[in-house]
UniProtKB/Swiss-Prot annotation:
Pfam families referenced in this protein's UniProt entry, alphabetically: Glutaredoxin (PF00462)
Name assigned to this protein: Glutaredoxin-2
Similarity remark: Belongs to the glutaredoxin family.
GO cellular component: cytoplasm; mitochondrion; nucleus
Gene3D superfamilies in alphabetical order: Glutaredoxin (3.40.30.10)
The organism of origin for this protein: Schizosaccharomyces pombe (strain 972 / ATCC 24843) (Fission yeast)
Reported function: The disulfide bond functions as an electron carrier in the glutathione-dependent synthesis of deoxyribonucleotides by the enzyme ribonucleotide reductase. In addition, it is also involved in reducing some disulfides in a coupled system with glutathione reductase. Thioltransferase catalyzes cellular thiol-disulfide transhydrogenation reactions. It transfers reducing equivalents to cytosolic protein and nonprotein disulfides.
Residue stretches making up the Glutaredoxin domain: 6-106
UniProt keyword annotations, A-Z: Disulfide bond, Electron transport, Redox-active center, Transport
An annotated GO BP: cellular response to oxidative stress
GO molecular-function term, one example from the UniProt record: protein-disulfide reductase activity
Disulfide bonds, paired cysteine numbers: 26-29
Matching InterPro entries: GLR_AS (IPR011767), Glutaredoxin (IPR002109), Glutaredoxin_euk/vir (IPR011899), Glutaredoxin_subgr (IPR014025), Thioredoxin-like_sf (IPR036249)
Length: 110
């Protein structure tokens, strides 16, 4: 893990309402991005298999979140988990509320 990877992740999650660290070939990543698109979530996806330092970024994400797989999804600076966690939020109705709060620029998301 490099300080470049740490800086990249921290800047990404600070600058985007929703950040998804993904891999282009991952079906769970695709499903998560499809869900976020369906709910009109303002998200930015970073394809770790397509960007420089992708493996270092994934190593830092593992250190930060204790999750070694992708997708890694953040709402503002709050790690919410992967696709199954996103689906739990969707099923409970919480995802709709979280996205509405993001769009209203509320600072409290969860």
């Amino acid at each position: 893990m490099t300080s470049i990877a740490k800086a990249f992740v921290e800047k990404a999650i600070s600058n985007n309402p929703v950040t998804v660290f993904s891999k282009s070939f991952c079906p769970f990543c695709k499903a998560a991005k499809n869900t976020l698109t369906k709910y009109s979530a303002p998200y930015k996806a970073y394809e770790l298999d397509k960007i420089e330092n992708g493996s270092d970024i994934q190593a830092y994400l593992h250190e930060k979140t204790k999750q070694s797989t992708v997708p890694s999804i953040f709402f503002r600076n709050q790690f919410i988990g992967g696709n199954s966690d996103l689906n739990k939020l969707r099923s409970s109705g919480t995802l709709t509320k979280m996205i509405a709060e993001l769009k209203e620029n509320k600072s409290s998301i969860l």
